[in-house]
Protein backbone atom coordinates (compact mmCIF):
# COMPACT_ATOMS: atom_id res chain seq x y z
CA UNK A 1 0.00 0.00 0.00
CA UNK A 2 0.87 3.67 0.07
CA UNK A 3 2.19 3.57 3.62
CA UNK A 4 4.55 0.73 2.76
CA UNK A 5 5.84 2.70 -0.23
CA UNK A 6 6.40 5.79 1.90
CA UNK A 7 8.08 3.72 4.60
CA UNK A 8 10.39 2.19 2.01
CA UNK A 9 11.28 5.57 0.56
CA UNK A 10 11.94 7.03 4.00
CA UNK A 11 14.09 4.06 4.94
CA UNK A 12 16.11 4.36 1.73
CA UNK A 13 16.63 8.07 2.34
CA UNK A 14 17.72 7.46 5.93
CA UNK A 15 20.17 4.74 4.90
CA UNK A 16 21.63 6.96 2.19
CA UNK A 17 21.98 9.84 4.63
CA UNK A 18 23.65 7.63 7.24
CA UNK A 19 26.06 6.33 4.61
CA UNK A 20 27.05 9.89 3.70
CA UNK A 21 27.50 10.86 7.34
CA UNK A 22 29.55 7.75 8.09
CA UNK A 23 31.63 8.43 4.99
CA UNK A 24 32.47 11.94 6.21
CA UNK A 25 33.08 10.92 9.81
CA UNK A 26 35.16 7.80 9.27
CA UNK A 27 36.54 8.41 5.79
CA UNK A 28 35.44 4.94 4.70
CA UNK A 29 33.45 5.30 1.50
Swiss-Prot record:
Localisation per UniProt entry: Secreted
Keywords: Antimicrobial, Disulfide bond, Secreted
Top-rank lineage group of the source organism: Eukaryota
GO biological process: defense response
Tissue and organ expression note: Expressed by the skin glands.
Keyword Signal: no
Cystines in this chain: 23-29
Family label: Belongs to the frog skin active peptide (FSAP) family. Brevinin subfamily.
Name this polypeptide is given: Brevinin-2Re
Organism: Pelophylax ridibundus (Marsh frog)
